[in-house]
UniProtKB/Swiss-Prot annotation:
GO molecular function: 2 iron, 2 sulfur cluster binding; metal ion binding; NADH dehydrogenase activity; quinone binding
Catalytic reaction annotation: a quinone + NADH + 5 H(+)(in) = a quinol + NAD(+) + 4 H(+)(out)
Top-level enzyme category: translocase
Cofactor annotation comment: Binds 1 [2Fe-2S] cluster.
Classification via Pfam families: 2Fe-2S_thioredx
Cofactor: [2Fe-2S] cluster
Name used for this protein in its record: NADH-quinone oxidoreductase subunit E
Organism listed in the record: Rickettsia conorii (strain ATCC VR-613 / Malish 7)
Gene name tied to this protein: nuoE
EC nos: 7.1.1.-
Length: 167
């Protein structure tokens, strides 16, 4: 299966949305729309940003590709490789680690049959580590796509995975 993306353009709906986003910024500051436009491109492309999508957004904002690439590689919310339908991101910073994020990672690996930074064969799950999600009071925390799961135990995490596997 060839997974290389050689071209990207926003579909009509997202192009209209991108234009509306850009209008929120002054003409001399439209480059500031880089984060929402990269996010829009990633959502349109199934959860990851191929190089042509980054190039497209850079051109749309009249900025050098390297500047857009720097943004895409700096923020952990952007994925430069394909991810599964469910992107499970386990917070492993100190508060989550103290409250058992290692155990959460272990149950994820066991239930999914993959290691950190891997995607299941059926492309349904990708397991990642992430830095602080800002929900330390409810550690350990996992983000799956756009949703946070807090105060997790191995049992709770196992049930979440079971539910998603049956989806």
């Amino acid at each position: 299966m060839n997974t290389k993306i050689t071209n990207f353009t926003f579909d009509k709906k997202n192009l209209n949305l991108a234009e509306e986003i850009i209008k929120k910024y002054p003409p001399h500051g439209k480059r500031s729309a880089i984060l929402p436009l990269l996010d829009l491109a990633q959502r349109q492309n199934g959860g990851w940003l191929p190089v042509p999508a980054i190039e497209y957004v850079a051109n749309m904002l009249a900025m050098p590709y390297i500047r857009a690439y720097e943004v895409a590689t700096f923020y952990t919310m952007f994925n430069l490789k394909r991810v599964g339908k469910y992107h499970i991101q386990v917070c492993t910073t100190t508060p989550c680690w103290l409250r058992g994020s290692d155990d959460i990672m272990k149950i994820c690996e066991k239930k999914l049959g993959v290691k950190l930074k891997e995607t299941t064969e059926d492309q349904k799950f990708t397991l990642s580590e992430i830095e602080c999600l800002g929900a330390c009071v409810n550690a350990p925390v996992v983000q799956i796509n756009d949703d946070y799961y807090e105060d997790l135990t191995q049992d709770k995490m196992g049930k979440i995975i079971d539910k998603l596997q049956n989806d």
